[in-house]
Amino acid sequence: MDCGLSFPEEEMLGIDLIIPDVTYLKENIDKVKAFVITHGHEDHIGAIPYVLKEVNVPIYATRLTMGLIESKLKEHNMLREVKRKVVRYGQSVTLGDFRVEFIRTNHSIADAAALAIFSPAGILVHTGDFKVDYTPVNGEPIDLQRFAELGKKGVLALMCDSTNALRPGFTMSERTVGSTFDKIFNDNKNSRIIIATFASNVDRVQQIINAAVAYGRKVCVEGRSMVNIIDVAEDLGYLHIPDGTLIETEAMKNYTPEQIVLITTGSQGESMAALSRMAANLHRKVSIQPGDCVVFSSTPIPGNEKSV
């Protein structure tokens, strides 16, 4: 289940990425049937091209997740070498003695799934990363009914996401962010607006685009991962961008600041992300100017507060 990477700590000089140790998988390759992927965040799919060079087995994932995986495989010239199968919510795949069902959940990336694993010993449920959102932007709330049905059948083990488990309360619906964007755009009608967010948060990007269209602004996109994910999401129908809304960053000079919204990476203060380079006057195309409205549309990941 999943095949992600992590990023190095500051003291890990010369290291760009940290990928899993696949020694066990290589030693037991006859037992490895497939990779089953819950969603398309880097810490869940980022290591796939590297690991598949050692353990080449089929991949099962939902549509957007598979689109992001395929983009990575293309970069590594591996697309033809890897068997892939797109799975719909409610659909199951059989892998040896196991049957794996994909269940719809909500997360900060579209097409996230939980996995119900039917084994000879009993049912195991792996939630993947999730939140309960009754009013998601894409109109597809988490399938709590299916979780309830599995609970009634009896679950041997639950492997559950525990992000923010120690914080009281609940996570607000992604849809509530839309009204915040509306206020920001309304309060900054004479400023260029620069919004940093996670590239993978397609629903967040959609709401930024909706606000830009409503206020008659053109949208520029900066940051390699942001450009890549927007391209994939739009091609697959997960992003709806009216014709003429997106412009190249070089074309900003043809518009006044109040006609522009810039969507960029760098919401976590990453030193090489587009926003950080803009702030340091190191970006080739954009620098932050007096009067710009800069919005961090994300919460700092624990440990990133200082960078932000």
Predicted regions: what is each one?
Residues K33, L156, I260, D292-V295:
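Conserved acidic residues
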Residues Q259-Q268:
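Conserved two-lobed SF2 helicase motor
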Residues E101, I263-T264, V295:
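Residues in well-ordered beta-strands of folded domains
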Residues M1-V36, H41-Y255, E270-S287, I301-V308:
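His/Asp/Glu-rich metal-coordinating catalytic cores
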